[in-house]
């Protein structure tokens, strides 16, 4: 399982990563957690290898999470999308 954490705030990415890692460990599940500071960086990585799920911050500088989701859906309809905000 590959999970993307996309947020322009490093502290928010770190917090979500910790929470996800804790929940995965509690369930005995393994996943590759990757962090991205922009929608553009996430989409570039997704072209190389698809993600199982992506947590997208709605309000990011530049490309928003909603814009990244729309772009992703043009090529990948299977990735689970979860929208976040602070």
Task: Describe the predicted segments one by one.
Residues 56-57:
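Active-site T/S-Asp motif of two-component receiver
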Residues 78-86:
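A short, hydrophobic beta-strand element within the central beta-sheet of small alpha/beta folds
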Residues 38, 64-67:
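Acidic catalytic/metal-coordinating carboxylates
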Residues 60:
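Receiver (REC) domain active-site loop signature in two-component systems and cognate sites
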Residues 35-53:
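Acidic, metal-coordinating helix/loop segments flanking the phosphotransfer/catalytic sites
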Residues 47-51, 71-78:
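Conserved phosphotransfer cores of two-component systems
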Residues 9-34:
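Two-component/phosphorelay signaling modules centered on CheY-like receiver
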């Amino acid at each position: 399982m590959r999970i993307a954490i996309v947020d322009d705030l490093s502290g928010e990415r770190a917090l979500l990563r910790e929470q996800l890692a804790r929940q995965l460990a509690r369930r005995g599940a393994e996943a590759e957690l990757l962090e991205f500071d922009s929608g553009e960086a996430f989409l570039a990585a997704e072209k190389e290898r698809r993600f199982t799920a992506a947590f997208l911050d709605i309000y990011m500088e530049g490309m928003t999470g909603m814009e990244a989701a729309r772009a992703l859906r043009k090529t990948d309809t299977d990735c689970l999308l979860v929208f976040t905000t602070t």
